[in-house]
């Protein structure tokens, strides 16, 4: 049953007389406290915060002066007391509440400056179980929620970045209701995200990827000019996951990334991470979250040139992802064509100077590559719900391939098959990818019919051959990958017509035998992976 409200109007302005300060992140707290003290505000604090303020020479009362009870159990119990929560929750204009405060000697707290134990940071750094549990804050969230609930009378500040706003607000000694309400909303968002991080950590510990309640929390990193289209609003929220990528990257030059830039850059970097840098340099060029070209080569510059050769028209205004440090030679190649974003693990000083010639080109350094095998979750909103699944961490290297045709693929065909299947994993379904010699020869993406994807990829390959002045398209003698099974022989026959000599696909169609027979008829080698890579 809902709790009834006393419906007492909230005052617009509340004078700040007593402030409770209890922070884990102590940045700016001494300066804030000094300003409050100069305004005649009584300072009350706890533990390490009390010590920091006292060491700075500020007059500060220990919270035990409000509670009449010392901190116990290594500080686990210090603010969970009516002397604190009564001071935060009391409705000042209610006679009954005022009487209770007077009877029990409870001091009204007008300002609560609180931030929490660094649970998210400890978790991200891989803290052991006892340490992580010890960094679950109890008293902090309780005080924040109490203060936020009673924002009619109490101002709560949870983010050091808001200290300047607070000082500006209380220049006259009071806070307005609108400000208190805004800070309360931010406070509840903070405790919600904090609890979400704890809940999700327990789900990981207990190996429960789909718990009964799934909470997804994030912190606004930047508000964007617009979303996918100019009439849509957008923001970029970060979860605290340290997986190298666009969320953790340093922007070395260029203007703010757009919504589409972030989406495409993430897709590009996840794709190029499939190729181990110690084996060979790799480059992926992305447009609308689909690859235009992907290649490996002895040098990074050559990998870029080979990736570009697959579809230089579509690559215009695209995203370039590299699996090794961006060097000067590669940078010189990239600046020849209009590019939106470059993302790489690192960037040499020489490359930075070259890219600086294009000041609008966004340059990101991540400090590392994401591990495709690392477990994780992806989420997608639908009307009235949220679709959550584990990340597609399937790797071709971990699959035992099954040769289903009379002819076994050659060693080179097998390498081309694996390369093509890696790329197909990152192409929107229906996906068909031709590859030859560590280079995509043609990519067909996002078609409702798989045979159309095969045809489009072949057409792209023919166009690329003409642009490069080649006698024949690179699909001649190539391997072709399909991210899902070939439902009919028509897709296979289209690939054969384009010149493919080897096919890799998951298998599992009701017409597998028909498709295998068509491959045998044309002396084409085919392997089944048993793993599908749908991407929508």
Curated annotation (Swiss-Prot):
Catalytic function, reaction form: (6R)-10-formyltetrahydrofolate + 5-amino-1-(5-phospho-beta-D-ribosyl)imidazole-4-carboxamide = 5-formamido-1-(5-phospho-D-ribosyl)imidazole-4-carboxamide + (6S)-5,6,7,8-tetrahydrofolate; IMP + H2O = 5-formamido-1-(5-phospho-D-ribosyl)imidazole-4-carboxamide
MF terms (GO), sorted A to Z: IMP cyclohydrolase activity; phosphoribosylaminoimidazolecarboxamide formyltransferase activity
Pathway stated in the Swiss-Prot or TrEMBL entry: Purine metabolism; IMP biosynthesis via de novo pathway; 5-formamido-1-(5-phospho-D-ribosyl)imidazole-4-carboxamide from 5-amino-1-(5-phospho-D-ribosyl)imidazole-4-carboxamide (10-formyl THF route): step 1/1; Purine metabolism; IMP biosynthesis via de novo pathway; IMP from 5-formamido-1-(5-phospho-D-ribosyl)imidazole-4-carboxamide: step 1/1
Domain annotation MGS-like: ranges: 8-158
GO cellular component, one term: cytosol
GO biological process: 'de novo' IMP biosynthetic process
Signal peptide coordinates: none
E.C. code: 2.1.2.3, 3.5.4.10
SUPFAM superfamilies in the record: Cytidine deaminase-like, Methylglyoxal synthase-like
Keywords assigned by UniProt, alphabetized: Hydrolase, Multifunctional enzyme, Purine biosynthesis, Transferase
Disulfide bonds: none
Pfam short name (any one): AICARFT_IMPCHas
Keyword flag Ion transport: no
InterPro entries assigned: AICAR_Tfase_dup_dom_sf, Cytidine_deaminase-like, MGS-like_dom, MGS-like_dom_sf, PurH-like
CDD domains named among the record's database cross-references: IMPCH (cd01421)
HAMAP family: PurH
Free-text comment on this protein's domains from its UniProt entry: The IMP cyclohydrolase activity resides in the N-terminal region.
Family, similarity comment: Belongs to the PurH family.
Name used for this protein in its record: Bifunctional purine biosynthesis protein PurH
